[in-house]
């Protein structure tokens, strides 16, 4: 019976293992850390590295300084990537929309930093066969998506948000693009932030204006590329001239010119887009 103590030890060890397994099976799964809908980490980075110009009508980015803060940026990107699709789906619409806008902007900065300072435009990151917005390299909601997916298949998807103001919130790292806001978009202030982004952009005469000599509106190419988004009836507006009418005071100076814009019966021309990097060198 010399091996009896050994057998007893094995039986006790086996029993302990079964008890531990049973406890593990009944213990609730560890909860995912609560997501910070204030996006405080992203705001901290933006406040350090974004230079607002002309009251926020435009902005430049200190990409060189951003590169020195790469660890903080990656920590924020990791927090975005850790959100499961089921969790995202359970959020409110403002929470989802703010998340996607911030994700687009933050991953765009990360994309620029992969080659900075050896580029003059985000387009330098593409090729003859594929634009820089097409590769599916962004880990988001449990899969790999492209920047185009975030913008066109999530934010612009019909029935999801149907809000043309998104075009004044996402930033493509280019001078022609609406300003990268110097703070994160947050759910509880999202409406006000989107309204302000639209006002800032429409106030920038270098990109949107009424040309009195030619008697026409001259606006950003964004309105040409995404004109359909301004015909969806958001806030009762179903055309680009009707949208521009809201900003008559920003687009024109003389009262008669403003009345023409408000009448929403003006011709529209689209300005060339400046794809140079929005770099504060």
Residue ranges, per PLM feature:
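N-terminal secretory signal peptides and thylakoid transit peptides that target proteins
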Residues: 2-18
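Short alpha-helical segments used as structural interaction elements across diverse proteins
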Residues: 4-5, 24, 93
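Short, intrinsically disordered low-complexity segments
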Residues: 6-7, 26, 59
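A broad helix-preferring feature
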Residues: 18-24
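Boundary at the C-terminal end of the N-terminal hydrophobic targeting segment
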Residues: 24, 29-31
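Interaction/scaffold regions that mediate signaling and macromolecular assembly across diverse proteins
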Residues: 32-90, 94-98, 108-281
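Surface-exposed, glycine/proline- and aromatic-rich loop segments on solvent-exposed faces
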Residues: 101
């Amino acid at each position: 019976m010399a091996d009896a103590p050994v057998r007893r030890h094995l039986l006790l060890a086996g029993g302990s293992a079964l008890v531990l397994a049973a406890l593990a099976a009944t213990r609730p799964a560890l909860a995912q850390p609560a997501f910070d809908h204030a996006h405080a980490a992203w705001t901290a980075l933006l406040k350090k590295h974004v230079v607002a110009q002309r009251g926020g009508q435009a902005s430049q980015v200190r990409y060189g300084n951003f590169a020195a803060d790469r660890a903080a940026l990656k920590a924020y990107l990791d927090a975005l990537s850790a959100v499961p699709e089921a969790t995202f789906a359970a959020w409110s619409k403002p929470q989802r929309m703010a998340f996607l806008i911030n994700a687009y902007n933050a991953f765009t900065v990360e994309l620029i930093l992969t080659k900075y300072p050896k580029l003059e435009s985000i387009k330098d990151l593409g090729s003859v066969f594929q634009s820089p917005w097409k590769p599916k390299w962004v880990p988001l909601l449990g899969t790999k998506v492209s920047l185009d997916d975030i913008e066109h298949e999530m934010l612009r998807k019909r029935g999801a948000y149907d809000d043309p103001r998104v075009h004044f919130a996402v930033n493509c790292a280019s001078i022609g693009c609406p300003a990268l806001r110097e703070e994160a978009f947050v759910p509880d202030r999202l409406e006000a932030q989107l309204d302000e982004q639209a006002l800032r952009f429409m106030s920038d005469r270098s990109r949107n204006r009424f040309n009195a000599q030619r008697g026409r509106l001259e606006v950003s190419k964004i309105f040409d590329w995404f004109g359909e988004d301004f015909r969806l009836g958001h806030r009762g507006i179903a055309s680009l001239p009707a949208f521009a009418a809201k900003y008559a005071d920003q687009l024109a100076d003389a009262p008669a010119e403003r009345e023409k814009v408000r009448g929403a019966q003006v011709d529209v021309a689209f300005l060339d887009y400046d794809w140079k990097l929005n770099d504060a060198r």
